[in-house]
Amino acid sequence: MKYDFAAIEKKWQDKWEQVKPYAAVTGDKRPKFYGLIEFPYPSAAGLHVGHPRPFTAMDIICRKKRMQGYNVLNPIGFDAFGLPTENFAIKNHIHPAIVTQQNIKNFTRQLKMLGYGFDWDRVIDTTDPQYYKWTQWIFLQMFKHDLAYKTTMPVNWCTSCKCVLANEEVVEGVCERCGAPVIRKEKSQWMLRITKYADRLIDDLDDVDYIERVKTQQRNWIGRSTGTEVTFKTNTEDDITVYTTRVDTLFGVTYTVISPEHPLLKKWKSIIKNWDEVEAYQAAAARKSDFERGELNKDKTGVRLDGIEVINPATGKVVPMFVSDYVLMGYGTGIVMGVPGHDQRDWDFATAFGLPIVEVVEGGDITKEAFTLKDDTGIMVNSGFLNGMTVKEAIPAMKQYAVEQGWGREKVNYKLRDWVFSRQRYWGEPIPLVNCPKCGWVPVPEEELPLVLPQVDSYELTDDGESPLSKMTDWVNTKCPKCGGPAKRETDTMPQWAGSSWYFLRYMDPHNDHEPVSHEAENYWGPVDWYNGGMEHTTLHLLYSRFWHKFLYDIGVVHTKEPYAKRTSHGMILGQNPHYVGNVSTQEEKDALIAKYGNQALRPAVKMSKSLGNVVNPDDVVKVYGADTMRLYIMFIGDFEKVATWSDDAVKGCKRFLDRVWNLADQVTEEEGVSEKNAPIVHKTIKKVTDDIDTLKMNTAIAALMAMVNEFYSNGLSRGDFEALLLMLSPFAPHMVEELWEQKGFAAKYEGKMAMQCAWPEYDESKTVASSVEMAVQVSGKFKGTIIVPVDSDQDTVVEAAKASEKVAKAIAGMQIVKVIHVKNKLVNLIVKPC
């Protein structure tokens, strides 16, 4: 009978919908396993083939865990607030809530089409007021604990989205979402004090099983360093403070640089003789993003502050001060010291402005470039009492001296900045605060939550960059919850990251009207046992959610310090490049492609995009090949953690494999147990597939199943052999397996249980290695047949077995064996001559 995947897949999806085999039970006595994927943003385009890669992998892991006796929570939801939906609503004049529900409906259809074993009774939607009620509640607890505050500051402003971006949302000077240029702009913003948790966010990484790349990225982003704060006297009434990790180089300081945003500049306005020049430079710097001022800032610019003098505390010499946009107010003190002899950026700046360059660590030629050490073994020179010391010795010596002299103190510094939390957009969680002229910022009473996002006539941004909510005077004007006087609601909304910072907790208890999650549910399910997600979220969602979880731990909502016990990541799936030079034959055509598309034309595969027309829609794949083929291929495509390229031809190969499994059913004998002949390959494959799923080596697990099927076609197979195959294949291709399981009578054998409800097969280590082996036999180099002998048989045993073969005995009749060539477990060659 032909494998009719369309009918079979619908049959079993309908059955799963009815019997709910994926329902998780809080408090069950079985050991729990909580497997989590990053919930998707429900875009209008629907799922693309990038989504199924992590979804399928976690589904396989969770299916195996169920079969191993675990009570599994494998939930799904939708991270549905955000700019794309709002922009779509503005363009098409439709409410974003309507768009969101349409998109969620389509995503749900696609997820069920692919046979994922989610617990559909636990679905969450971040735009549901009953969900964001608790997002607002958590924010209010942060406000009450002084972790949320409002301040006017230079922020990242997306010129297209017309809203504020967190530092983490700016990539190479452009908006992470839309790619538009990002500039700096002064705005009043709500902030969250994530910096108060910086040490814990670094230190607790030692207690979790994250892939090393994730840990490294988070440590680098937080950027903890131990150094010294050094006070420099000036010719004004103000001292300045500089943070450095290389206090040993103070004797080499020949200038200082202040950030254009530093408040001292305005204070010194009457002292700075070239103020107009400085003010113009400040204005130019304000139009640049941090990335333009740092990474892209190859040409060092600046203005010397005429009238400001700074005294180097180590040498007593006067050094000049400059204002330059490469110094950011957000890191350190907003003032840096220039050591041009040993920092290339400082050397470039000093060279550009004709400043002295002093060598304080010997070993390089500072007339050509800065001498930067790779280690701390350099010898100090031109450094007073430090001369002759190694850098390693000089750092603590100079630090101690600075502290004793009263112009230095030890300081731990961080690159991490507080989280810019408010957005001047409509489609987000309303911030539940009101501003009262008498009482200041006052929380909306908890019993009034959720503060529901009101309907508006227009989602267009205001000309001054304020939220569309600011135009709704009836909603904005309210009474102060504290004094009853007139007050105004906050009109900014929360960022998209708010709802995703705690969603994993809501899955544990999604219908609780009284608290975000009950202690009973959180104590049972927490922490998440395995969380898989994209590397692009390491310094965004992953860091934010760890921060929120630690706060919830501090106030007693959760019992674990970390939300996720394990974190893995997956590689992107690329599409075929329609502009690849390999697609054309003539050199003229190749040159034309390179001229038009540059280096992109040299890459056979690129990121999928609508503009390139290389996006692969799962609907199209499932329609032609079926969901099981799609699932199998997406796991067979390559190393899970690495980038892979989609190939239609390879999809066909996976379909052929499933066809072979389907047709194999007709060859099954009535022998109940695992056959003796197939026992080694069966037990070996069980071990391989079990280990490979646990280590995300899905491609090699599938290869092992393919090899076993080949053996079955060669050896024949028993019911026990086929049963083992179906159980192992079940997590990968659940629809077809359940159909074969039912057709071959295994469901009846196990009292109506589906394959997914039966125990995962176990292997016998002693049977993973074959007890016998088939060897080729040659007589004087000519093949005469094969023999079966015990594994690792010695030469005498092999020769006797060969001689017992009828064909060999006939070939050596009347001959004398003069030499034996024996390749253990593979071949024996009897060299003969006439007697």
Name every feature range the model reports, one short phrase each.
Residues 79, 144-156, 410-439, 496, ...:
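Helix-rich, typically C-terminal accessory recognition domains appended to large enzymatic cores
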Residues 27, 63-71, 91-97, 113-117, ...:
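Secondary-structure transition/capping motifs at alpha-helix termini
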Residues 3, 224-229, 237, 362-365, ...:
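Long, charged, mostly alpha-helical binding arms that flank functional sites
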Residues 1-36, 66-75, 99-106, 279-323, ...:
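Conserved oxyanion/phosphate-binding beta-strand-loop segments in alpha/beta enzyme cores
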Residues 24-94, 100, 123-138, 244-245, ...:
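N-terminal catalytic cores of NTP/NDP-binding nucleotidyl/phosphoryl-transfer enzymes
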